[in-house]
């Protein structure tokens, strides 16, 4: 057999395998996000979140999420996932939020038809890709301390203590 037809079959099978793999995937990957993140931001520390209101599932939410920056007064990406007891999605809501809306993450059973509602928050650019499905996923993930206080008083006390120690050694 000549190498030409065999190579053509190999390429055709490879293309078919890629098409089948793409057709089966109904979720976004981190690789997809690379195309959503431009190199400039409208303000220092600007970030984006997937945003949608009551989408049917995670795919529909992430697929149609507007590609815009979060308002300056927000800092976190919020996700609320309502699902059946079987785990099938009923609705997905994602948005940019301030700290106050992230203080009650976790899962709870809804009194409405036995549904489960899981809520999560995260800090970072487009960090709300996955859905919270259980207590392990329904967390508040932050990359910086929530209680950020001005560190100068502590630094000053350390500096003064070091100066006193140094002066004591010099005398």
Swiss-Prot record:
<protein>
    <recommendedName>
        <fullName>Ly6/PLAUR domain-containing protein 6</fullName>
    </recommendedName>
</protein>
<keyword id="KW-0964">Secreted</keyword>
<feature type="disulfide bond">
    <location>
        <begin position="70"/>
        <end position="96"/>
    </location>
</feature>
<feature type="glycosylation site" description="N-linked (GlcNAc...) asparagine">
    <location>
        <position position="147"/>
    </location>
</feature>
<feature type="disulfide bond">
    <location>
        <begin position="102"/>
        <end position="121"/>
    </location>
</feature>
<feature type="propeptide" description="Removed in mature form">
    <location>
        <begin position="148"/>
        <end position="171"/>
    </location>
</feature>
<keyword id="KW-0449">Lipoprotein</keyword>
<comment type="function">
    <text>Acts as a modulator of nicotinic acetylcholine receptors (nAChRs) function in the brain. Inhibits nicotine-induced Ca(2+) influx through nAChRs. In vitro, specifically inhibits alpha-3:beta-4 and alpha-7 nAChR currents in an allosteric manner. Acts as a positive regulator of Wnt/beta-catenin signaling.</text>
</comment>
<feature type="disulfide bond">
    <location>
        <begin position="122"/>
        <end position="127"/>
    </location>
</feature>
<feature type="short sequence motif" description="NxI motif">
    <location>
        <begin position="88"/>
        <end position="90"/>
    </location>
</feature>
<keyword id="KW-0472">Membrane</keyword>
<dbReference type="GO" id="GO:0005886">
    <property type="term" value="C:plasma membrane"/>
</dbReference>
<feature type="disulfide bond">
    <location>
        <begin position="107"/>
        <end position="118"/>
    </location>
</feature>
<keyword id="KW-0336">GPI-anchor</keyword>
<keyword id="KW-1003">Cell membrane</keyword>
<dbReference type="GO" id="GO:0090263">
    <property type="term" value="P:positive regulation of canonical Wnt signaling pathway"/>
</dbReference>
<dbReference type="GO" id="GO:0005737">
    <property type="term" value="C:cytoplasm"/>
</dbReference>
<feature type="disulfide bond">
    <location>
        <begin position="52"/>
        <end position="61"/>
    </location>
</feature>
<keyword id="KW-1015">Disulfide bond</keyword>
<dbReference type="GO" id="GO:0005576">
    <property type="term" value="C:extracellular region"/>
</dbReference>
<dbReference type="InterPro" id="IPR045860">
    <property type="entry name" value="Snake_toxin-like_sf"/>
</dbReference>
<dbReference type="GO" id="GO:0045202">
    <property type="term" value="C:synapse"/>
</dbReference>
<keyword id="KW-0770">Synapse</keyword>
<feature type="disulfide bond">
    <location>
        <begin position="49"/>
        <end position="77"/>
    </location>
</feature>
<comment type="subunit">
    <text>Interacts with nicotinic acetylcholine receptors (nAChRs) including CHRNA3, CHRNA4, CHRNA5, CHRNA6, CHRNA7, CHRNB2 and CHRNB4. Interacts (via NxI motif) with LRP6.</text>
</comment>
<keyword id="KW-0771">Synaptosome</keyword>
<dbReference type="GO" id="GO:0030550">
    <property type="term" value="F:acetylcholine receptor inhibitor activity"/>
</dbReference>
<dbReference type="GO" id="GO:0098552">
    <property type="term" value="C:side of membrane"/>
</dbReference>
<feature type="glycosylation site" description="N-linked (GlcNAc...) asparagine">
    <location>
        <position position="134"/>
    </location>
</feature>
<keyword id="KW-0963">Cytoplasm</keyword>
<dbReference type="InterPro" id="IPR039457">
    <property type="entry name" value="LYPD6-like"/>
</dbReference>
<keyword id="KW-0732">Signal</keyword>
<keyword id="KW-0966">Cell projection</keyword>
<feature type="domain" description="UPAR/Ly6">
    <location>
        <begin position="47"/>
        <end position="141"/>
    </location>
</feature>
<feature type="lipid moiety-binding region" description="GPI-anchor amidated asparagine">
    <location>
        <position position="147"/>
    </location>
</feature>
<keyword id="KW-0325">Glycoprotein</keyword>
<dbReference type="GO" id="GO:0030425">
    <property type="term" value="C:dendrite"/>
</dbReference>
<dbReference type="Pfam" id="PF16975">
    <property type="entry name" value="UPAR_LY6_2"/>
</dbReference>
<dbReference type="GO" id="GO:0045121">
    <property type="term" value="C:membrane raft"/>
</dbReference>
<feature type="signal peptide">
    <location>
        <begin position="1"/>
        <end position="22"/>
    </location>
</feature>
<dbReference type="GO" id="GO:0043204">
    <property type="term" value="C:perikaryon"/>
</dbReference>
